[in-house]
């Protein structure tokens, strides 16, 4: 029988989708930030393909420990920095030479305006409360560069306590262009967006397009 790790296969699939939009960075050193990246499986695949990438991991402190261990093992000799470095150096740490900067999630609001080339979130925003979604989106929409990308792969609808976490109600502003929008091949209850950041008042009208995605999913349930 063929044996494989489904989670690792999912990371391969997701990295393949994301890397198609990051190909221009193949020989450069972009800052790529993953929110809620688990142990670092997806980040390791991105890093293997964009070797100069400076990857910022944002997660729970206890998960940061696993990320530090795993990524240090996969990339022997990699420069892995953490919250201590941010505390001691401040934002200068972002200009340092590093492969991975591993930080608690709340540190996202320290990222300077228009400093990140790409954000990634796979199946963790769907676990967030309304307040946490608003916190992360405010930071992402400020710190992502114009023309930067946001890969957002999350459930259409998921109850989180008394809060109905709905993709079509995420606090996006209007200034996004859709590069990819599709249901996941392996998990059709997950929608996969890859979006490009646009300038303020771009006329992209993204929020209406987001609502249309939600309406289409609701109709599919009837």
Each language-model region and where it sits:
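S-adenosyl-L-methionine
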Residues: 71-112
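A short glycine-rich, Lys/Arg-flanked "PGG" loop and its adjoining helix->strand segment in the class I
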Residues: 134-146
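Membrane-proximal basic amphipathic "stem/tether" segments
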Residues: 197-222
